[in-house]
C-alpha cells in the first residue's frame, strides 16, 4: 500500500493519536453536549490533522505554511474547548492535563514545521 507524505510527518502522527484521545474522552460528555462541545471538539481536532495533510499536497512553501497555520488555529480552538470542558466538569483534571501536554507538543511541532516552510 502506498504511503503519502503527510503520514510520515511526526506532527500528523501525534495529531492522529490526539484525535483518538479526544473522541474517546468526549464519549463520556453529557448528551446535551452532543451537538455542542462534543461536535466542536471533534471537528476542530480532525481539522488539525486534515489541514496538515492538505498542506502537504501544495506545491509552494507559502501554501504549505498557510495550511499549517490553519492547523495551528484549529489547535488553539481545541485547547480553548478543552479548558471550557474542564471548567464545566466534563473532563477530569488528570485527563485535561494529559491532553493539554499533547496539545502543547503538537503546538511546538506545528510552529517548527511552519518556521521550516517559511524559510525561518
Regions found by a protein language model. Give the residues of each.
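Amphipathic alpha-helical assembly/interaction segments
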Residues: 1-120
